[in-house]
Amino acid sequence: MTIILCGLPTSGKSSLGKALAKFLNLPFYDLDDLIVSNYSSALYSSSAEIYKAYGDQKFSECEARILETLPPEDALISLGGGTLMYEASYRAIQTRGALVFLSVELPLIYERLEKRGLPERLKEAMKTKPLSEILTERIDRMKEIADYIFPVDHVDHSSKSSLEQASQDLITLLKS
């Protein structure tokens, strides 16, 4: 089975994705890492730098292209926080496997974003809309298209045991 994780920035897509992939012995694909490995250069070494250089539309096209070219075998895929706002990216994964929305209450997202900083895509979007509206739109979209909603407010992403427990809980949800 292929499992695709979506969620807001800081929801734990990468940390839980790695733990779950290890638990299930599946290959793990982090879309942000794949963007870097496919589009980095001497000038751009992070997905944030690539986003700034390419702009939103071209960056989104890159995400969709990568999703379309992933190997067909079962895997665990972690999407970017805004990936599913673009129809081409959704089309690339919609029949690929189980889409799981990692839900986190907004106050906790705000707290984490304040500590970690805003991703470039959010900074760009905030030129035309307030952050609360952007995040609410993303939540609504992910809830609408996700096969499963998995609350992760309680998960400590720096704790191996917490990630292992969340992995087991998510597997139980997927089997239900």
UniProtKB/Swiss-Prot annotation:
TM region(s), chain numbering: none
This protein's UniProt keywords: Amino-acid biosynthesis, Aromatic amino acid biosynthesis, ATP-binding, Cytoplasm, Kinase, Magnesium, Metal-binding, Nucleotide-binding, Transferase
Catalytic activity: shikimate + ATP = 3-phosphoshikimate + ADP + H(+)
Recorded GO CC terms: cytosol
Cofactor descriptive note: Binds 1 Mg(2+) ion per subunit.
Alphabetical list of SUPFAM superfamilies matching this protein: P-loop containing nucleoside triphosphate hydrolases (SSF52540)
Subunit structure, interactors included: Monomer.
Residues annotated to bind ATP: T10, S11, G12, K13, S14, S15
Pathway in which the depicted protein is active: Metabolic intermediate biosynthesis; chorismate biosynthesis; chorismate from D-erythrose 4-phosphate and phosphoenolpyruvate: step 5/7
Cited function: Catalyzes the specific phosphorylation of the 3-hydroxyl group of shikimic acid using ATP as a cosubstrate.
Residues involved in Mg(2+) binding: S14
Subcellular location: Cytoplasm
EC numbers: 2.7.1.71
Cofactor entry: Mg(2+)
Family: Belongs to the shikimate kinase family.
CDD domains reported in the protein's UniProt record: SK
Enzyme class: transferase
Annotated gene: aroK
Protein name in UniProt: Shikimate kinase
Primary location: cytoplasm
BP GO terms, sorted: amino acid biosynthetic process; aromatic amino acid family biosynthetic process; chorismate biosynthetic process
GO molecular function: ATP binding; magnesium ion binding; shikimate kinase activity
